[in-house]
């Protein structure tokens, strides 16, 4: 994927005192605009309507419900998902097609929403800014943004968005997925069953899910941790939560009826 850059003025403005919510939202808007031009998004109105309804159902129960959340299905066969600061969540069609129930898709969305709620990418960017700001300045002033040196320094946005989160970040996002799905009235066990599927596929077809595990570290230990989060809730409080809906079934059938995803673009 072509790297995506945050405007220089935003980087300078955020360096001295951290990244505010307003700056995060503006960065996210810039980032998402470029991603939406570069990635093949599914344009089907019904598919987009459903993914946004389900995503909003979860995001509206979080501490950052005030963000203008947007959810997209990327028309790509590889299994992956990611989120951009400010409330932009992208799920690859290949991952959606591996879900069999609504609660599994909700678990995926809840996890990516969790990264935004906890500002994981923003925190990575804040750490990187101090080291990279000098190279960024040199790149802008000397117009050598395609050089290896510039690529190493200026690409704060692209590196942060597509970075491999730490195991701690992933565990926190998993805990958020459980918390937020429960708050939305959705069975949190989809978080676990989805991950079990991907781990099983990794053993039989590792290439099919390599992109997902490259950006989402951890395996069985995350299942144990997610189950521990679920166990914090009385069993009686989870008994009547939703696992599946007819709307999800229609959404999944529509996804699977689409023409094959386009081949990946040359890097």
Regions found by a protein language model. Name each.
Residues 2-6, 17-267:
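A Zn2+-metalloprotease active-site environment signal
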